[in-house]
Amino acid sequence: MDLIFTSVLIGIGLAMDCLAVSFAVGAHQKTSRIRAAFILALFFGGFQGGMTLLGWLLGSGFADAIAAYDHWVAAGLLFIIGGKMVLDGIKDGHEEEAPDVFNFVAVFILAVATSIDALAVGLSFSLLHIVPLIPALIIGLISAIFSVGGVYSGGKIGHILGKRVDILGGVILTLIGIRILLEHLVWNGAGA
């Protein structure tokens, strides 16, 4: 199969987490959607492409070391952020200004959590002796595009649902974390 076509398919698969997280953030963010879309596209696209290259550079020796706990880290980060969003959504009281989800730490955590699979893809490129520069660029670009789409579609839904969208966003992030754990612990037959 052609490397570019395969890279597009891999990019779409990896971008689904970026899309879901961007949707949740877009729905939660009340203002500055252009800024939100730009920041998430930059971070998510950059991290997806960068982690693909990093995985390739580190090679197969590192895969065994990180495989034992990568899913716990990614899921834990998503559970923390998702749980905070759910709690914010169920708090009684008047509508508060949305928290600044675009501080560096929050965006960094989300970017790392959504790009750990890209690290594994890069490791597989290393094992297959594929130089991943073009695939990493394609993966990063697709993730950036999906991130922009997620912010804008989440923003449209956010206006309809109001404060309940915090709960929806938190549930989405938590479900992504659960999916990551199920993939590694159940569906792949891996142990804890």
Curated annotation (Swiss-Prot):
Swiss-Prot/TrEMBL keywords: Cell membrane, Ion transport, Manganese, Membrane, Transmembrane, Transmembrane helix, Transport
Stored InterPro entries: Mntp/YtaF, Put_MntP
Gene Ontology CC entries for this record: plasma membrane
Protein family: Belongs to the MntP (TC 9.B.29) family.
Subcellular location, principal: membrane
Organism: Methanospirillum hungatei JF-1 (strain ATCC 27890 / DSM 864 / NBRC 100397 / JF-1)
Pfam families, sorted: Mntp
Entry's localization field: Cell membrane
Membrane topology: Multi-pass membrane protein
Purpose of the protein: Probably functions as a manganese efflux pump.
Gene name linked to the record: mntP
GO terms of molecular function: manganese ion transmembrane transporter activity
PANTHER family reported in the protein's UniProt record: MANGANESE EFFLUX PUMP MNTP-RELATED
Transmembrane segments: 3-23, 38-58, 61-81, 101-121, 130-150, 167-187
Protein's UniProt name: Putative manganese efflux pump MntP
Organism placement in taxonomy: Archaea, Methanobacteriati, Methanobacteriota, Stenosarchaea group, Methanomicrobia
